[in-house]
């Protein structure tokens, strides 16, 4: 499940998006 716009890195790993989480495992 992708929340918000597609980001290169999720916030959990210091991504450029605020409050956006993308599953990259």
Swiss-Prot record:
GO molecular function: serine-type endopeptidase inhibitor activity
Site keyed Reactive bond: positions: 17-18
BPTI/Kunitz inhibitor domain location: 6-25
Principal location: secreted
Keywords tagged on the record: Protease inhibitor, Secreted, Serine protease inhibitor
Domain of life of the organism encoding this protein: Eukaryota
A GO CC term assigned to this protein in UniProt: extracellular region
Location within or outside the cell: Secreted
Protein task: Inhibits bovine trypsin, human plasma kallikrein and human neutrophil elastase.
Protein name, as recorded: Kunitz-type serine protease inhibitor 2
């Amino acid at each position: 499940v992708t929340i918000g716009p597609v980001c290169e890195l999720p916030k959990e790993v210091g991504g450029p998006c605020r409050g956006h989480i993308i599953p990259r495992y």
